[in-house]
């Protein structure tokens, strides 16, 4: 097999980046995608803010994103990569744009290479900036890209795409299960159509026997901390260390980007929070919630929540999500950029009877366990793909 290495700007039609300006946020319009909306090979514009049509068109005069282009985060968290599989209608800011001339093969090959350990290592070793790491446009254009004959490249892409298709199908099943769990919570505790609701009187706005609290009255609210980053040994362990960068919207978190040692844990203000702890991000990406699937530590930009009156974390998790959505609505287009301990004084937690809670936990636990199983399967598929990827792309394993 004959291989060559060429520059990214030779491989691509062009290599560009998104706007460096900060267009004004609008209530409706077009999404402005940044690096934080690219994660695990997917582009998720749902959390991006909207900009006007005028700003959208202005950005796209030089940075139009089209099908089979490749996007990559280039500032802050560098190297999150995704190929554009659909016909997008968003603009980009501070994101690398590799134009692939509408070629599915070129787009997928490049995306797979940029996700490989070779490419990630190259980019990691060439980042600039002290407080915030970045890759310059000049560096992006000069990235080395290995190429082979088109037939071989297609075979490699086809093999890796099988894994991606399985991962994508798995993610769709997870989403359906998440929606089922959310519907169950809404039906029982928002619409109040819980078992036995027909014969349960409403007293002071809630079903008889239910109790109303402020979150802070009934929930333990615990903060985290960060070991000194200059002490290398603190970050040479296997304890997952949760930060807002790990908040991808998943119901459960199994692992984190950063890990710390037991010595690092002993030298920071974080506890070692047990499995089942509910986490909410307080700064950065604010209001993202998750449930720890394994014990973890966390930094000071999050809160850990625990309620001893509840049988499991699931009712607390869904109730917290509902209240965070309400807080975002109350912001009414304003900036919802931080949660402090006093925030929990202003949000409510209604606790049903133990009988209703026990039945809910029994039903929803079955759904949540299926979600965890599917998430583990997705992780194993991704790990298998990632082990295979460099061997296929280097020619170590031929297809």
Regions flagged by a language model, labelled:
Residues 34-35, 54-115, 243-244, 257-323, ...:
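A short beta-sheet element
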Residues 1-18, 142-191, 195-226, 350, ...:
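Non-catalytic DNA-recognition/assembly elements of restriction-modification systems
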Residues 5-24, 36-67, 213-232, 240-275, ...:
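Sequence-specific dsDNA recognition surfaces
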Residues 6, 108, 112, 116-117, ...:
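Residues on a specific face of well-ordered alpha-helices
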């Amino acid at each position: 097999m004959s291989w060559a290495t060429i520059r990214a700007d030779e491989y691509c039609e062009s290599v560009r980046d998104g706007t460096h300006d900060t267009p004004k946020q609008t209530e409706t319009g077009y999404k402005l995608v940044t690096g934080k909306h690219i994660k695990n090979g997917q582009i998720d514009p749902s959390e991006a803010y909207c900009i006007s049509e005028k700003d959208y068109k202005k950005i796209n005069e030089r940075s139009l994103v089209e099908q089979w282009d490749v996007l990559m985060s280039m500032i802050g968290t560098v190297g999150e990569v995704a190929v554009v599989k659909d016909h997008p209608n968003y603009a980009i800011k501070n994101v690398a744009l590799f134009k692939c001339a509408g070629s599915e093969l070129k787009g997928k090959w490049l995306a797979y290479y940029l996700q490989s350990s070779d490419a990630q290592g190259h980019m990691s070793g060439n980042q600039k900036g002290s407080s915030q790491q970045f890759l310059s446009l000049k560096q992006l254009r000069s990235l080395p890209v290995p190429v082979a004959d088109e037939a071989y490249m297609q075979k490699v892409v086809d093999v890796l795409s099988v894994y991606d298709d399985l991962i994508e199908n798995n993610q769709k099943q997870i989403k359906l299960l998440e929606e089922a769990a959310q519907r169950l919570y809404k039906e029982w505790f928002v619409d109040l159509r819980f078992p036995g609701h027909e014969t349960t009187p409403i007293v002071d706005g809630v079903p008889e026997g239910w109790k109303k609290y402020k979150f802070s009255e009934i929930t333990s609210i615990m903060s985290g901390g960060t070991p000194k980053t200059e002490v290398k040994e603190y970050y040479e362990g296997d304890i997952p260390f949760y930060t807002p960068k790990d908040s991808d919207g998943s119901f459960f978190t199994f692992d984190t980007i950063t890990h710390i040692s037991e010595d690092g844990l002993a030298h920071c203000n974080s506890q070692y929070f047990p499995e089942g702890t509910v986490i909410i991000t307080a700064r950065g990406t604010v209001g993202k919630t998750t449930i720890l699937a394994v014990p973890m530590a966390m930094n000071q930009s999050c809160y850990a929540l625990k309620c001893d009156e509840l049988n499991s974390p699931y009712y607390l998790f869904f109730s917290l999500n509902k209240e965070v959505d309400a807080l975002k609505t109350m912001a009414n287009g304003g900036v919802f950029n931080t949660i402090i301990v006093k925030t929990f004084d202003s949000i409510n937690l209604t606790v049903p009877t133990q009988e209703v809670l026990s039945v809910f936990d029994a039903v929803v636990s079955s759904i949540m366990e299926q979600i965890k199983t599917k998430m583990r399967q997705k992780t194993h598929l991704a790990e298998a793909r990632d082990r295979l990827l460099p061997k296929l792309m280097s020619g170590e394993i031929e297809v």
